[in-house]
Amino acid sequence: MYEYLDRRYALALYEVAEENNKVDEYLKDLKEVVNIIKNSEDICKILKHPEINTSRKKEIFTELFKDKVDDKILSFLLVLIEKDRILYLEEKLKEMEKIYLEKNNMILANVKTVIPLLKEEREELIEKLGNKYNKKIILEEEIDKSIIGGVYVRVGDDVLDGTLSTRLKDIKKMMLKRE
């Protein structure tokens, strides 16, 4: 529902990062801030607490991140607090990462297998996907025992499901239809 808004915030920060030649630094800093927020119950409680006013929340964030992140990122965080969107910072980070990939002619491919891909398999998969999408492929691998065997690949909205678990489900459906 708020993806459009997340994208706008991310694009604004990305443009500032580009102007300052600090895109990688901003992405790294945002990831760290997201991790700190996600892993700190205290920060989450402060951000959600209705009796702690916005000014106090901004003061706390300024104290926490003043010398740890770029001033422009801190300003961005304070705007998100002001607009009551700071708890959705991770979504803005994801959108910013998407923008980074788009601007650098890259695309993310999620791959699930039961065992890790061999170096040759990984290289072949990257090459084939690169040819298909005409972009540099960033492979994100995941081990998933539930697929039993085969490979599951997701690139954007495209899915290639060559897993044994899916084939078995399809066979089961066919057999149940015949009964």
Curated annotation (Swiss-Prot):
F-type ATPases have 2 components, F(1) - the catalytic core - and F(0) - the membrane proton channel. F(1) has five subunits: alpha(3), beta(3), gamma(1), delta(1), epsilon(1). F(0) has three main subunits: a(1), b(2) and c(10-14). The alpha and beta chains form an alternating ring which encloses part of the gamma chain. F(1) is attached to F(0) by a central stalk formed by the gamma and epsilon chains, while a peripheral stalk is formed by the delta and b chains. PANTHER family: ATP SYNTHASE DELTA CHAIN. It holds the Pfam family OSCP. GO terms for molecular function: proton-transporting ATP synthase activity, rotational mechanism. The gene is atpH. Its main location: membrane. This is ATP synthase subunit delta. Belongs to the ATPase delta chain family. One of its GO terms (cellular component) is plasma membrane. NCBIfam families: ATP_synt_delta, PRK05758.2-4.
